[in-house]
Amino acid sequence: METKPKTATTIKVPPGPLGYVYARACPSEGIELLALLSARSGDSDVAVAPLVVGLTVESGFEANVAVVVGSRTTGLGGTAVSLKLTPSHYSSSVYVFHGGRHLDPSTQAPNLTRLCERARRHFGFSDYTPRPGDLKHETTGEALCERLGLDPDRALLYLVVTEGFKEAVSINNTFLHLGGSDKVTIGGAEVHRIPVYPLQLFMPDFSRVIAEPFNANHRSIGEKFTYPLPFFNRPLNRLLFEAVVGPAAVALRCRNVDAVARAAAHLAFDENHEGAALPADITFTAFEASQGKTPRGERDGGGKGAAGGFEQRLASVMAGDAALALESIVSMAVFDEPPTDISAWPLFEGQDTAAARANAVGAYLARAAGLVGAMVFSTNSALHLTEVDDAGPADPKDHSKPSFYRFFLVPGTHVAANPQVDREGHVVPGFEGRPTAPLVGGTQEFAGEHLAMLCGFSPALLAKMLFYLERCDGAVIVGRQEMDVFRYVADSNQTDVPCNLCTFDTRHACVHTTLMRLRARHPKFASAARGAIGVFGTMNSMYSDCDVLGNYAAFSALKRADGSETARTIMQETYRAATERVMAELETLQYVDQAVPTAMGRLETIITNREALHTVVNNVRQVVDREVEQLMRNLVEGRNFKFRDGLGEANHAMSLTLDPYACGPCPLLQLLGRRSNLAVYQDLALSQCHGVFAGQSVEGRNFRNQFQPVLRRRVMDMFNNGFLSAKTLTVALSEGAAICAPSLTAGQTAPAESSFEGDVARVTLGFPKELRVKSRVLFAGASANASEAAKARVASLQSAYQKPDKRVDILLGPLGFLLKQFHAAIFPNGKPPGSNQPNPQWFWTALQRNQLPARLLSREDIETIAFIKKFSLDYGAINFINLAPNNVSELAMYYMANQILRYCDHSTYFINTLTAIIAGSRRPPSVQAAAAWSAQGGAGLEAGARALVDAVDAHPGAWTSMFASCNLLRPVMAARPMVVLGLSISKYYGMAGNDRVFQAGNWASLMGGKNACPLLIFDRTRKFVLACPRAGFVCAASSLGGGAHESSLCEQLRGIISEGGAAVASSVFVATVKSLGPRTQQLQIEDWLALLEDEYLSEEMMELTARALERGNGEWSTDAALEVAHEAEALVSQLGNAGEVFNFGDFGCEDDNATPFGGPGAPGPAFAGRKRAFHGDDPFGEGPPDKKGDLTLDML
């Protein structure tokens, strides 16, 4: 595998401070939008908000900056001073430390600060405790307001800070340059801006964290320098401690949170530091091995139990240290994407009032709730993978043999309360007597304390987490019982509730109640095996290789070495371009809408009779056949492309950016992205630990400091080797930019000086840019060199990929979606006796069972039946896609892929397919769904919730999440969505003798099944991704170019559909009513579409629901619903006095020599406008086409 050479790009950035304190009067307009986008707990005056141009920062805000981080002595005598600058970018979040109470809280949940403090103590993490001396020198928000002439009761103060120096602010290593304050305009209002600089400016050649910032007599302070007052604001420091440092401490398993802050700040100031940054006295979580697993102490063989546990703990801290260093490198990166500008958000188009704009933002955030829920409830989510386990050496006889997979991340949420041990494995003081929960088989309930830990014990982030969870459902759509919140709250007044956070009047919004409502979806940690990581990321390129055959015949494979062709010429002959031409032609015919692949175009006005159906199907077939023939001719004749080998090497692929401004404008979504990145960094570092340990005396006290640089270099060497794409930048100061900084002698209230000289300390910078995720198109067997375990795994997969040898129901075949939607136009007489409503399920079931009376069929009907059966059987013979088309777009793309597979002689196994589960939003489908937002609690809860639903337009946040699936991913990915998916990173060496470690980011699964997302299906041939589109909402729209199997209502209903039969609709309705009971009436058309993936049946379900309510005089009655269903079933079961029946199975078998489509006898263009001839064409040719040999021009 060859990688692209690294290229250095010179980029110019302006010099500037490490941050600003913005001070403004509370805006009269836009405050509701800011509150919706922010994270704030109701019991706190602080908040975290997104960095948004036009909302929190001014237009023209420069995101990339060369930060003034210190000073250096220069000149012969060392008497002159120059400034030291480091590139960085501004954090995508801003931190409100005064006036946060003017923002509506993200949730009504009470006492979240108390919950976070209790959780922090329970899991052993340190609390924020300022030093007594610091409190004497606090710079309060009120004092700043007084200095700037603002009313403290109406002011809003927040910190905008560069990514690498947030921790420096939290440990008081910065000061406010009051003399450099200026004014900017945000949203038409004047805003004060005070620059923030590091104290290291006054300590030349001091590139470390200042342990005692308030010591004005520090020996490193330059001669005659006027040392400023360090910036210490207690609410801000606590906010940064909780929302910035806390999540990193949880991810890196470091109970001493302050030590993480100091380590990160030190890495920002000292660009040359490569040793250990985390403290030497770090502790580790003790946990028992899972049942049936060799105890960790014995895994290294030879009875060296202590050594085995020691290496596991050493790998844990060294991988965490390497991840922190890697995050520090990324924090110094310079990105191309500018911060999002609220005035350019497409979702505001046509929204003329403030209320309409707030509603649009509320609806969009509810979309993201589905992704947040998946990250919380998936057991392999990066949020839960907080511990390191040891699988033992790859070769028990040779402990030095390196293994990339010896150390790996495992879920640690449920064992976080276990005792803490030191590096030797001894329990540390304060944790004696604590019970030790096992990794697998524990009985811990997922509680509010666990949720607080996922948020780093930040009340603000926890409040925003609850904002999203309140918009998730408890998997009603898959048939689970959801708690009745009204009854629970009413009953709790007479019973003991195990919660000391709420009262009877606030219980409906309490975190405990929200988790109780979602109890069926709670993560269940039933495995500690090495597996995929559930990650949250963002697609920031509209290009992806997510077509049915992925990157088959891609530009890079067709490009000639001599470079004699233009890129446009090459691109026209790729598989991707061929699919674009097919879709464009079908869009011209008005069959599809490329921007919405699930849409049916204008087919409702086109298919008005059976002849129109013939025309549509034939046109689709001919368009595809023509493009495939031309594509294969160009590949073979023009380029000598090894088309069969190319199929074996084809992958579905996409890239997830590490650019922080590409994420959604929400602090919690940014947290999910950060935690995902930290998990990926640790996974890479853990793969190199065994190689670093091999042959070394790991017990030595100095081992970490000595070998941490080795591990760091190994991780850095993994860049650009297949998975983690990196970019090398040469950073220079902007042309003509003057370096302005505070005077070192005149004091912090003096104006800035622009006579400084300075240079960039990190001139050439290499940093990760994106993660490459891919999935092989073909099912690949184990290689000859694979291990026995790998061969066994592949053998277990073969049955899942094996194409079954059975005839598929016509309605579940390629034309099923057309036959169901347009049955009345195609077969107007295809209705049960005594019914006036044409019914496709009854018609095709009776037809295929040879039970349909022949007198009901005209000659035109028989010709159409022959045409449909011929197409369905021929398609089935060459089909290797384990999905039936749901629309014309899918029909065309699947047919095209199958034709290419036929040319390549593919056989036996289904290919891998992709499905996007697209997050959407809607108003609350029931009063219960709005319970958490009710202004009234206690006895008035139901009335309050009903009043909210009745006036729902007045509540911009009153939206809930929903999902829809789509099997054509390229248009979905072109919307540059936020995504959640499983990611498994393979590592391997290159060619023999090459010590470069290559990686592959494999598209894997989220564990937890329906807990993670109600529409996830256990199917090894399909890869799923949850997607929340950004283009068209918060950025410009782009132009088109294994968990355990769980039975659910979703699968039960699809099983009924796959079995077929005349009474499918009634059977589906009965199964739903028996499962959901009265909740069936709450299902809307979107829910039925998500459950059934069938538009016709979804409309039938809505009609049956309406009839059931009508039968019950407007009230839901299960008996009435079942009665309606049985009447519908009886109607379609009637065949009357059939007399002679039409023999569907034998009809047309007199011609055994018909040619399947795609062969030499395929109809020409003239066929599109005429009916198919009844005699002479075999509509029942069921045999697969003969295998082709080498492709020849005659075949083409």
Swiss-Prot record:
Required for filament formation, short sequence motif: residues: 843-844, 1142-1144
SUPFAM superfamilies: Viral ssDNA binding protein
Matches recorded under Pfam families: Viral_DNA_bp (PF00747)
Region (Disordered): 1158-1196
InterPro entries: DBP_sf, Viral_ssDBP_head, Viral_ssDNA-bd
Protein keywords: DNA replication, DNA-binding, Host nucleus, Metal-binding, Zinc, Zinc-finger
Coiled-coil boundaries: none
Gene Ontology molecular-function annotations: single-stranded DNA binding; zinc ion binding
Chief subcellular location: host cell
Protein localization: Host nucleus
Compositionally biased tracts (Basic and acidic residues): 1174-1196
Job description of the protein: Plays several crucial roles in viral infection. Participates in the opening of the viral DNA origin to initiate replication by interacting with the origin-binding protein. May disrupt loops, hairpins and other secondary structures present on ssDNA to reduce and eliminate pausing of viral DNA polymerase at specific sites during elongation. Promotes viral DNA recombination by performing strand-transfer, characterized by the ability to transfer a DNA strand from a linear duplex to a complementary single-stranded DNA circle. Can also catalyze the renaturation of complementary single strands.
UniProt similarity note: Belongs to the herpesviridae major DNA-binding protein family.
HAMAP family membership: HSV_DNBI
Subunit: Homooligomers. Forms double-helical filaments necessary for the formation of replication compartments within the host nucleus. Interacts with the origin-binding protein. Interacts with the helicase primase complex; this interaction stimulates primer synthesis activity of the helicase-primase complex. Interacts with the DNA polymerase. Interacts with the alkaline exonuclease; this interaction increases its nuclease processivity.
Name of this protein: Major DNA-binding protein
